[in-house]
From Swiss-Prot:
Class of enzymatic activity (EC top level): hydrolase
A Gene Ontology BP annotation from the UniProt entry: protein dephosphorylation
Enzyme Commission designation: 3.1.3.16
Catalyzed reactions: O-phospho-L-seryl-[protein] + H2O = L-seryl-[protein] + phosphate; O-phospho-L-threonyl-[protein] + H2O = L-threonyl-[protein] + phosphate
Binding note for cofactor: Binds 2 manganese ions per subunit.
Posttranslational mods: Reversibly methyl esterified on Leu-313 by leucine carboxyl methyltransferase 1 (LCMT1) and pectin methylesterase 1 (PME1). Carboxyl methylation influences the affinity of the catalytic subunit for the different regulatory subunits, thereby modulating the PP2A holoenzyme's substrate specificity, enzyme activity and cellular localization. Phosphorylation of either threonine (by autophosphorylation-activated protein kinase) or tyrosine results in inactivation of the phosphatase. Auto-dephosphorylation has been suggested as a mechanism for reactivation.
Residues binding Mn(2+) 1: 61, 63, 89
Name this polypeptide is given: Serine/threonine-protein phosphatase PP2A-4 catalytic subunit
Binding site for Mn(2+) 2: 89, 121, 171, 245
Superkingdom classification of source: Eukaryota
Signal peptide start and end residues: none
Residues that bear Leucine methyl ester: 313
C-alpha cells in the first residue's frame, strides 16, 4: 500500500499505533505479533542489496535511545515526508529498545517505500540476550514472546542497501569472501547472524588505518584497509561506503580518503559517552550534508548506566 492510498481500517489502526509509539508507549503483545507478520511479508520481498532512491537520509545506530530517535525525526523530518535509511542496531543498551524497534517496524509497514531498515549485529538472538533487549522485553511484557517475535523478524531485514547505484550502505563493513554486490545478492540471509563468514562480516567488520585485512578485536568480522575499500568501490562502480557500528565523537567520521564514512545516530551513547550524533542527507543531485544533533532532553532517567560496559560492540 502506497503512502497516498485511501485509508482503510488497517491503516487507521496503524496510524493510531504509530502515534501511540511516538509517545513512547509500547503496543500490546498481540499488536506486535500482527505488526511483525505484516512486516515479514514486506521484508521477504526486499533484496540483500536493497535499492534506494535519493533524496534519502541515512542514519546509524540508535540502540534503544527512543527520545533521541524522536529528536532525529524532528530534525530530519517526519516519515513519510523524508525518505529514511537506517543501518541497524535499533536495540540493546538504551532503555527503550521495545518502543524504538516497534516504531521503526510500524513505519516500515505503513510506508514501505519511504523507509529502509537494515540489519545490524545487534539484531540477533544471541547478542540481544546479553545486551538488554531480552531483559527489557521480559520486564515490559512479563514473558519473552515479544523478544522472540522481533528476533524472528530480524532474520528478514535486508543486509545492505544501494543508494542510486553509488552509495553502498551497511551496518559493519567488507568481507574477504565478497568481491561484488552480486555475491551478496546471492546468499540466503534468513537466519541468525552466523559467527563467521560473509554475512557475519557485513555486520561486524570495521575500516582501519592499516592496509589489507586484519583480525578484528571484536572477535567477529575483520578490519579492512583503504586498499580494500578502493578495490571494492572500483569493482562495483561505487562512490562511497556508508556504515555505522562504531561510536564516533562527532557523529560522523570519514576514512580511507573519503571512500568510507561512519555514521552514528545515538547521541551521548549509553547516556554517558558525551558524543554528538549525526544523520547524512543525500539530495536529488547526490550531494551530501551531515546534520549533527545532541541528546533530546530527558525526564526521569538515570544519568549513567548502572554498570559501565567492558567494551563496545
Amino acid at each position: 500500500m502506497g503512502a497516498n492510498s485511501l485509508p482503510t481500517d488497517a491503516t487507521l489502526d496503524l496510524d493510531e499505533q504509530i502515534s501511540q509509539l511516538m509517545q513512547c508507549k509500547p503496543l500490546s503483545e498481540q499488536q506486535v505479533r500482527a505488526l511483525c507478520e505484516k512486516a515479514k511479508e514486506i521484508l521477504m520481498d526486499e533484496s540483500n542489496v536493497q535499492p534506494v532512491k535519493s533524496p534519502v537520509t541515512i542514519c546509524g545506530d540508535i540502540h534503544g535511545q527512543f527520545h533521541d530517535l524522536a529528536e532525529l525525526f524532528r530534525i530530519g523530518g517526519k516519515c513519510p515526508d523524508t525518505n529514511y535509511l537506517f543501518m541497524g542496531d535499533y536495540v540493546d543498551r538504551g532503555y527503550y529498545s521495545v518502543e524504538t524497534v516497534t516504531l521503526l517496524v510500524g513505519l516500515k509497514v505503513r510506508y514501505p517505500q519511504r523507509i529502509t531498515i537494515l540489519r545490524g549485529n545487534h539484531e540477533s538472538r544471541q547478542i540481544t540476550q546479553v545486551y538488554g533487549f531480552y531483559d527489557e522485553c521480559l520486564r515490559k511484557y512479563g514473558n519473552a514472546n515479544v523478544w522472540k517475535i522481533f528476533t524472528d523478524l530480524f532474520d528478514y531485514f535486508p543486509l545492505t542497501a544501494l543508494v542510486e547505484s553509488e552509495i553502498f550502505c551497511l551496518h559493519g563493513g567488507l568481507s574477504p569472501s565478497i568481491e561484488t554486490l552480486d555475491n551478496i545478492r546471492n546468499f540466503d540471509r534468513v537466519q541468525e547472524v552466523p559467527h563467521e563468514g560473509p554475512m557475519c562480516d557485513l555486520l561486524w567488520s570495521d575500516p582501519d588505518d592499516r592496509c589489507g585485512w586484519g583480525i578484528s578485536p571484536r572477535g567477529a568480522g575483520y578490519t579492512f584497509g583503504q586498499d580494500i575499500s578502493e578495490q571494492f568501490n572500483h569493482t562495483n562502480n561505487l562512490k562511497l561506503i556508508a556504515r555505522a557500528h562504531q561510536l564516533v565523537m562527532d557523529g560522523f567520521n570519514w576514512a580511507h580518503e573519503q571512500k568510507v564514512v561512519t555514521i552514528f545516530s545515538a547521541p551521548n551513547y549509553c547516556y554517558r559517552c558525551g558524543n554528538m550524533a549525526s544523520i547524512l542527507e543525500v539530495d536529488d543531485c547526490r550531494n551530501h550534508t551531515f546534520i549533527q544533533f545532541e541528546p533530546a532532553p530527558r525526564r526521569g532517567e538515570p544519568d549513567v548506566t548502572r554498570r559501565t560496559p567492558d567494551y563496545f560492540l
